């Protein structure tokens, strides 16, 4: 998982409340047995004018010119600005996979669905909760100025605007540690590899029958 320390990126405003996980990545794309390739289908039913299916060549599909991520001014955005209750609905880890693979490093909103919020941390996407007033201000700024960028300082837990205004946000120390050092669940386990090997060696000495292979 990629480390997240300080990130500066273009902001794309998604001015909709209660965006659920089926809107983030529609259910038909959950059939895939791979963990990759979901970025092209992020917000599929909003980005395209036709119905998408797994394995389809998205480069030939008709796009919805009115959808925010299809507008040239937001091309390459790495921060998604959203409204309250983002990520509600069914639990699917494919939602943060799609956001990450599209290129988003962070999502800013007044509130998130709990399961989605936790899944973001596990997959390298930083979900940031700000007040509705702060989010309203960022929407106004993003829509008023082309190329609007924010700086996110995870160590300092601040979102910094171009004029230097800093908004503080909360993050659990454990989640912060994992993002700062790029540690997913596997990475966290491997931090204790020496202890695991020592335990395995001791277990074989104490219970050798567990190491016996069946014919």
Swiss-Prot record:
Record GO terms (molecular function): 3-isopropylmalate dehydratase activity
Catalytic reactions on record: (2R,3S)-3-isopropylmalate = (2S)-2-isopropylmalate
EC number: 4.2.1.33
Keyword Amino-acid biosynthesis: yes
Entry's Gene Ontology BP terms: L-leucine biosynthetic process
Protein name from the UniProt record: 3-isopropylmalate dehydratase small subunit
Organism field: Polynucleobacter asymbioticus (strain DSM 18221 / CIP 109841 / QLW-P1DMWA-1) (Polynucleobacter necessarius subsp. asymbioticus)
InterPro entries registered for this protein in UniProt: 3-IsopropMal_deHydase_ssu, Aconitase/3IPM_dehydase_swvl, AconitaseA/IPMdHydase_ssu_swvl, IPMI_Swivel, LeuD
